[in-house]
Amino acid sequence: ARVVLGCWSVLSQAAQTDDEERAGNRRPIWIMGHMVNAIGQIDEFVNLGANSIETDVSFDDNANPEYTYHGIPCDCGRNCKKYENFNDFLKGLRSATTPGNSKYQEKLVLVVFDLKTGSLYDNQANDAGKKLAKNLLQHYWNNGNNGGRAYIVLSIPDLNHYPLIKGFKDQLTKDGHPELMDKVGHDFSGNDDIGDVGKAYKKAGITGHIWQSDGITNCLPRGLSRVNAAVANRDSANGFINKVYYWTVDKRSTTRDALDAGVDGIMTNYPDVITDVLNEAAYKKKFRVATYDDNPWVTFKK
């Protein structure tokens, strides 16, 4: 009997270790489909393994979000000109992220809006935030009535445009849905000094829900020194960053380097490449693809 019990205890320990590896001890990873600007591309990227997408948002002269459009130049090997009217895209996105909808994609849990605010004057940033919130509330969140469930990151390229965040928040509050800010996170995407990014969040009055991007077009190489600085901030007791993502990663070797550096998200034109690396024995033990149950605003503690 003792022998049997001995085996049983070894087996249960092994099972426990498996469970821990399956969830708690593995870093959840967001595979972020890059430049998903046409509704048809949502399914295309998710079916290749993306659990997150990045969508460009261009503005008109009055700071209204207008198109999901990148334009030329863009990443090597991509069509830069695909687009939708912003509100049409939001409706398509809502279908893809609303349980019960025939177009529902359960795996799609995070959307990064790459806000092309470079066309705006600095004093239009607050207004752009308000108008963005109005559009999302109506066409994505369905005025708070069983809308899309994905978490949203507002990615701003210019630190001077931090008032966009306040405009966005104020508008949701004014329209009676401040609780939707629970679903909203932030990113400054200009590769600025990490200290300067921290100062911009202080001015904006933001703590928490912070993703930090680092990267460059896939046409050019870029080292990991700033990623390492962002990860160090995230992992320090007094850091302000919750998650770090790296863009645009299309090669297996770069994917491994980024994972080894400890990123939480990898933006890519080829989600299947990232998926393949995550399935390699060395990485399967340490990482897993994030699901809806993984709160993207919570810092993962090793």
Curated annotation (Swiss-Prot):
GO CC annotation: extracellular region
Q: Which Pfam families match?
A: GDPD_2
Q: Specify the superkingdom.
A: Eukaryota
Gene3D superfamilies linked to this entry: Phosphatidylinositol (PI) phosphodiesterase
Q: Which UniProt keywords apply?
A: Cytolysis, Dermonecrotic toxin, Disulfide bond, Hemolysis, Lipid degradation, Lipid metabolism, Lyase, Magnesium, Metal-binding, Secreted, Signal, Toxin, Zymogen
* Tissue occurrence: Expressed by the venom gland.
Q: Which EC numbers characterise this protein's activity in its record?
A: 4.6.1.-
**Protein name according to UniProt:** Dermonecrotic toxin LiSicTox-alphaIA1bii
